[in-house]
């Protein structure tokens, strides 16, 4: 009697985008991060990008960094050697404000900030 073979595909998300605005292209952001990390010789264990309000990021900045100022990004880095693991919090208010000031699209500015966050983990 012939035996049956089964192939299971397990897809593990190594990059999460939480509360990502509809205006941002998740796939473009993901590809940019993967290409950047790989080009520098690192790997990704798990990255969580959290898009939060100006007020929420200010609260995190006060609580964990003792800074009473607005910022565009805060990175909590849990990486070991060259395997990146981090929680990254991004203020869409700051992204939108910087995009206007720098005459950039919101997506281009978001790409810059998302890249900035992962670079925090690489020194």
Residue locations for each model-derived region?
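An acidic/histidine-cluster motif and surrounding catalytic segment
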Residues: 1-111, 119-123
């Amino acid at each position: 009697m012939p035996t049956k073979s089964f192939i299971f595909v397990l897809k593990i998300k190594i990059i999460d985008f939480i509360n990502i605005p509809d205006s941002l292209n998740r796939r473009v952001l993901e590809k940019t991060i993967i290409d950047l990390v790989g080009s520098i010789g690192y790997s990704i264990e798990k990255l969580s990008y959290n898009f939060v309000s100006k007020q929420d990021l200010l609260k995190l900045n006060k609580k964990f960094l003792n800074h009473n100022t607005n910022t565009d990004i805060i990175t909590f880095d849990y990486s070991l050697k060259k395997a990146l693991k981090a929680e990254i919090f991004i203020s869409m208010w700051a992204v939108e404000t910087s995009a206007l000031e720098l005459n950039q699209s919101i997506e281009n500015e978001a790409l810059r900030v998302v890249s900035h966050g992962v670079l925090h983990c690489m020194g």
